[in-house]
Amino acid sequence: MTIKNKVIIITGASSGIGKATALLLAEKGAKLVLAARRVEKLEKIVQTIKANSGEAIFAKTDVTKREDNKKLVELAIERYGKVDAIFLNAGIMPNSPLSALKEDEWEQMIDINIKGVLNGIAAVLPSFIAQKSGHIIATSSVAGLKAYPGGAVYGATKWAVRDLMEVLRMESAQEGTNIRTVTIYPAAINTELLETITDKETEQGMTSLYKQYGITPDRIASIVAYAIDQPEDVNVNEFTVGPTSQPW
């Protein structure tokens, strides 16, 4: 199998893991449809890809809106005739103790981290079912595997992603739709996630952790590329990825 000429949608593509994955997949010959809310950043990434003889387009997308997700898939099909894979990567991590009662941030995490993934699945599933193939990749987190103080709501949203993706894999196998799923559980990866934390004590603790252990997002990009490059009859459905030096 090869990544070359595969049509791949990436959400949360304007920075961090999404950006790193876009650049790597473009280098390997994929045709990309990049999605995020920050259009100016998407424009620069697409310019970089095209300057290196790659192929990519972009669309301003709010993953919390069903119509934005549907239009994203429609754009990919209109431009390239199909969708082979979608990387549901958009997410936020405004961690805080439950006692801080940051209810607005709780809702934002639920909307982006859970509903955003559901909206992406709903948008692409009809095409994947019709063509009896497709690859759905989602960014969860080690927080979806291991609880820690300050990460209650974030961890809950990432556990939800884990469950959604596993059930999707099981149902696809039962229904014979040949849809593969991959769930990635990153640990300390140096992205913009920490910028979403408003609780000072939590922000200081997480910043210290990431400064000590954090690795670059291209490490996750290589995992995404590896998964997409597998034969159609192989589903490598889970990856936990973190710094060698990080104890958890």
Swiss-Prot record:
Pfam families with a match to the protein in the record: adh_short
RNA-binding keyword on record: no
GO molecular function, one term: oxidoreductase activity
Cysteine disulfide links: none
E.C. code: 1.-.-.-
Binding site for substrate: S141
SUPFAM superfamilies: NAD(P)-binding Rossmann-fold domains
Coiled-coil stretches noted in the UniProt entry, renumbered to this chain: none
Active site, renumbered: Y154
Keyword annotations of the record: Oxidoreductase
UniProt KW Oxidoreductase keyword: yes
Residue numbers binding NADP(+): 9-33
Record family assignment: Belongs to the short-chain dehydrogenases/reductases (SDR) family.
Record-linked PANTHER family: DEHYDROGENASE/REDUCTASE SDR FAMILY MEMBER 11, DEHYDROGENASE_REDUCTASE SDR FAMILY MEMBER 11
Name of the featured protein: Uncharacterized oxidoreductase Lmo0432
Organism: Listeria monocytogenes serovar 1/2a (strain ATCC BAA-679 / EGD-e)
